[in-house]
Amino acid sequence: MEVPTLELKKFIRDIPDFPEKGIIFRDITPLLKNPEAFNFAIDQLVNKLKEIEFNTIVAPEARGFIFGGALAYKLGKGLVPVRKPGKLPYKVISEKYSLEYGEAELQMHIDAISQGEKVIIFDDVLATGGTALALKKLVEKAGGEVVSMAFLIELTYLNPRKLLSKENIISLITY
């Protein structure tokens, strides 16, 4: 069964007031559970990314790992995992940032990106743009160049492109 692009929204569950009151959480676990929907989403993202010249996908935990790993495999690229503090075993660089519902920090191994390496940032959801901007800063601290940012879901009502106005942004599903 092939799932049309617009139908992917049927596999995303809205959870009101999570993780706090006033937030609508877009839960992708039904999409992940459905093999046709998950494969279709990956294939659609691959089609959007395959013409871009890059070496590595940088993806934050946890849901970014799921899609980032699948995309890196399908595209024959490397994957750099970005984690919360204290989760990586080697020397790290860090970046603090604001979330839709608070503050956070991300870390990446200091040697994960080479000087001049072309990178695509991938995350499951683009909300305010804060996480994506923090990821870009980490890549640039390491000497890399972000050539594109890709997302499964973009929450356009939060206007994330304002913060990321200079970025090449690719989104599969918008709300």
From Swiss-Prot:
Gene Ontology molecular functions: adenine binding; adenine phosphoribosyltransferase activity; AMP binding
Superkingdom of source: Bacteria
Q: In which pathway does it act?
A: Purine metabolism; AMP biosynthesis via salvage pathway; AMP from adenine: step 1/1
Q: Does the keyword Cytoplasm apply?
A: yes
**One GO BP:** purine ribonucleoside salvage
Quaternary structure, per UniProt, is:
Homodimer.
Q: Which NCBIfam families match?
A: apt, PRK02304.1-3, PRK02304.1-5
Q: Under what name is this protein listed? A: Adenine phosphoribosyltransferase
Q: What is the lineage of its organism?
A: Bacteria, Thermotogati, Thermotogota, Thermotogae, Thermotogales
